[in-house]
């Protein structure tokens, strides 16, 4: 597209939309037009091993003409909603690029408010290098955040499931209650946390009887 006079093309993608704990991260990336051997493994970040993503992240930053990552907290997701957080984050990620693109590609996401033309591509993180690069930046950034968060909240196994709604995770919320980093606006978190509160109330009542 840049060769057709549209200017640099930025890919945008998110990580953590489907999680119930922790932030959502949104990345934007502009890569050179020419193939880059060190980035030959680039594809949808969900199809890459953790070790491959870790290796690719510094290489993407090394070769990118511009890149940015925006992190939106669980508290803001609860306040504004995940859809608003996602769209706002994508606009902010593109605006934060040191080189402004002439065109934006998203992974199937419709994003009103871009200042340049854009195109949602279904399966874009597997077919467009710039989206794949943004996908890796977003996911690896968020995975690192969740691994660090596990040190502060060790009861939930965040370093394993990265805040997604696994059985082990939701059982932990029922047993320990939700942490400040959980998304209380999500029905499964609210329900599990309420079950913990109910059990805690019963324990208090029995203990005081």
UniProtKB/Swiss-Prot annotation:
Annotated GO biological process: DNA replication, removal of RNA primer; mismatch repair
Protein task: Endonuclease that specifically degrades the RNA of RNA-DNA hybrids.
Cofactor field: Mn(2+); Mg(2+)
Family matches, as InterPro entries: RNase_HII, RNase_HII/HIII, RNase_HII/HIII_dom, RNaseH-like_sf, RNaseH_sf
Record-linked HAMAP family: RNase_HII_B (MF_00052_B)
Protein name: Ribonuclease HII
Cofactor note: Manganese or magnesium. Binds 1 divalent metal ion per monomer in the absence of substrate. May bind a second metal ion after substrate binding.
Record carries keyword tRNA processing: no
Subcellular location(s) per record: Cytoplasm
Organism this protein belongs to: Corynebacterium glutamicum (strain ATCC 13032 / DSM 20300 / JCM 1318 / BCRC 11384 / CCUG 27702 / LMG 3730 / NBRC 12168 / NCIMB 10025 / NRRL B-2784 / 534)
């Amino acid at each position: 597209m840049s060769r057709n006079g549209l200017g640099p093309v930025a890919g945008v993608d998110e990580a953590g939309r489907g999680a119930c704990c922790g932030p959502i991260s949104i990345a934007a990336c502009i890569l050179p037009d020419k193939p880059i051997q060190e980035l030959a493994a680039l594809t949808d970040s969900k199809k890459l091993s953790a070790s491959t993503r870790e290796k690719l992240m510094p290489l993407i930053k090394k070769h990118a003409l511009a890149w940015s990552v925006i992190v939106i907290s669980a508290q803001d997701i609860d306040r504004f909603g995940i859809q608003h957080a996602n769209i706002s984050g994508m606009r902010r990620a593109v605006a934060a690029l040191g080189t402004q693109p002439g065109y934006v590609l998203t992974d199937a996401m419709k994003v009103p408010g871009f200042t340049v033309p854009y195109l949602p591509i279904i399966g874009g993180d597997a077919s467009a290098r710039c989206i794949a690069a943004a996908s890796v930046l977003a996911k690896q950034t968020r995975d690192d955040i969740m691994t660090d968060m596990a040190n502060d909240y060790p009861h939930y196994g965040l370093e394993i499931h990265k805040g997604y709604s696994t059985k082990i995770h939701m059982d932990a919320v029922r047993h320990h209650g939700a942490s400040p980093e959980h998304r209380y606006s999500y029905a499964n978190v609210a329900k599990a946390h309420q079950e913990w509160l109910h059990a805690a109330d019963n324990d208090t009542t029995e203990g005081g009887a």
